[in-house]
Curated annotation (Swiss-Prot):
One of its GO terms (biological process) is translation. The keyword ATP-binding applies. PROSITE patterns: GATB. This is Aspartyl/glutamyl-tRNA(Asn/Gln) amidotransferase subunit B. Its EC number is 6.3.5.-. It comes from the Bacteria. It comes from Streptococcus pneumoniae (strain ATCC 700669 / Spain 23F-1). It catalyses: L-glutamyl-tRNA(Gln) + L-glutamine + ATP + H2O = L-glutaminyl-tRNA(Gln) + L-glutamate + ADP + phosphate + H(+); L-aspartyl-tRNA(Asn) + L-glutamine + ATP + H2O = L-asparaginyl-tRNA(Asn) + L-glutamate + ADP + phosphate + 2 H(+).
Length: 480
């Protein structure tokens, strides 16, 4: 029997506000344990939450970017549960009326087709703290993350393969990043994914029993975990067994999912309206103000790169996959850089350098200005493409102007025949055996002089000019 895969994803995204959702403490990642806390985060008696307007701004932008309807009458709810990293014993979230609902996003699949994935809801909530279990037998609680604003984006169960889930996450990350509401860095926990997966016989409308997958710390692991679950569940069903409703985690080392706990039934969080936060209304004017702050999104930008700048679909997709890279490209082209040349450098030498150094584009000294200047002095013959690679490394590490560095470092390409011809004659004088081979008609003897000349000029001879002059002088040599 063949089965249809049914997948839905729950994605938690940390919003990049300066302060937390209900307290004025910093929401910055990476500070010392419990440095970003105050009496609200510790839930001292009598303290009251105050909603951060920037969080609602970000929620509206997310809803608009994901084609969602917006609940204009806003309220929050208490989700009650006890855990050491949750000192209030409840989480302030949104239950029955999330800020956004009934949305969708279009994703591009590997075969070039597109598919629209529904988004059930997006709700605002506060993050919990973090427990660390020490080797000394103690558990430690860090509340820096407590109260950091989150938006949880819940998809419809519209994905029918791990590939589609991967494509959905890729598209969602792009949209959130371009909207400017999160840096969506999974390695820092600012984007976290839980997956629900079930199988059902083809043609059956009723969903099968679902399994929830956790510990998915990369898009690649989401895909691998789902692929494993498809195989595991299919084998159980084909052997006549039944799928249990359970939570499993993906074990990267064993490339398998491992049971965490069996779910007996739905958890009862005893939601009720948050009494310490008043109801308020999101006006049409507020929504339109947020709409005007949204940028051009990746899909539209890719289309423009192809139609207006003449880039290939592949180049356009690579450039727009990251907002920082795309914005860098935009500025470089606006400064007069050739779109194809800028694209080639960003996808080639720049990408290789970043991978080797373990850095991002923002962490190096290369700017759109000095990249365009470097491309310009390649095109006008000041430096060769080979020398340009050395110039780029200097710019990436030290910044500054490309032309100024080239002139100070003595890297200017030699194109003047009055300089090159005497060097060619000296090459002939220094390599009498090669000259004899050439005059005797030895096959490919002329090619040795190209290497001699480039070594004599330390690679600074303009290849086109140098080869033309070399051929000219070799012809004279043969005549004599």
């Amino acid at each position: 029997m063949n089965f249809e895969t049914v997948i839905g994803l729950e994605v938690h995204v940390e919003l990049n506000t300066n302060s937390k959702i209900f307290s004025p403490t910093s929401a910055h990642f990476g500070n010392d344990q419990n440095a970003n806390t105050n009496v609200i985060d510790w839930s001292f008696p009598g303290v009251l939450p105050v909603l951060n307007k920037g969080v609602v701004d970000a929620g509206i932008k997310a809803a608009l970017a994901l084609n969602m309807d917006i609940h204009k009458k806003m309220h929050f709810d208490r989700k009650n549960y006890f855990y050491p990293d949750n000192p209030k014993a409840y989480q302030i979230s949104q239950f029955d009326e999330p800020i956004g609902y009934n949305g969708w996003i279009e994703v591009e699949l590997e075969d070039g087709t597109t598919k629209k994935i529904g988004i059930e809801r997006a709700h605002l909530e506060e993050d919990a703290g973090k427990n660390t279990h020490g080797t000394d037998g103690y558990s430690y609680v860090d509340l820096n993350r407590q109260g950091v604003p989150l938006i949880e984006i819940v998809s419809e169960a519209d994905m029918r393969s791990p590939e589609e889930a991967y494509a959905y996450l890729t598209a969602l990350k792009e949209v959130i990043q371009y909207a400017g509401i999160s840096d969506v860095k999974m390695e820092e926990g600012s984007m976290r994914v839980d997956a629900n997966i079930s199988l059902r016989p083809y043609g059956q409308e009723k969903f099968g029993t679902k399994t929830e997958l956790k510990n998915l710390n990369s898009f690649s692991n989401v895909r691998k975990g789902l692929e494993y679950e498809v195989q595991r569940q299919a084998e159980i069903l084909r052997s006549g067994g039944q799928i249990r409703q359970e939570t499993r985690r993906y074990d990267e080392a064993n490339k398998a999912t491992i049971l965490m706990r069996v779910k007996e039934g739905a958890a009862d969080y005893r939601y009720f309206p948050e009494p310490d936060l008043p109801l308020f209304e999101i006006s049409d004017e507020w929504i339109e103000e947020m709409r005007t702050e949204l940028p051009e999104f990746p899909k539209e930008r890719r289309a423009r790169y192809v139609s207006d700048l003449g880039l290939s679909d592949y180049d356009a997709s690579q450039l727009t996959a990251n907002k920082v890279t795309s914005n860098f490209f935009e500025k470089a082209v606006a400064l007069g850089g050739d779109a194809k040349q800028v694209s080639n450098w960003l996808q080639g030498e720049v990408a290789q350098f970043l991978n080797a150094e373990g850095k991002t584009l923002e962490q190096i000294e290369l700017t759109p200005e000095n990249l365009v200047e470097m491309i310009t002095i390649i095109e006008d013959g000041t430096i060769s493409s080979k020398i340009a690679k050395k110039v780029f490394v200097h710019l990436a590490k030290n910044g500054g102007g490309a032309r100024e560095y080239v002139e100070k470092a003595g890297m200017v390409q030699i194109s003047d025949p009055a300089i090159l011809i005497p060097i060619i004659h000296q090459v002939f004088a220094d390599n009498e055996a090669a000259v004899a081979d050439f005059k005797s008609g030895k096959r490919n003897a002329d090619k040795a002089f190209t290497g001699f000349l480039m070594r004599a000029t330390k690679g600074q001879a303009n290849p086109q000019v140098a080869l033309k002059l070399l051929a000219q002088e070799l012809a004279k040599l043969k005549e004599n």
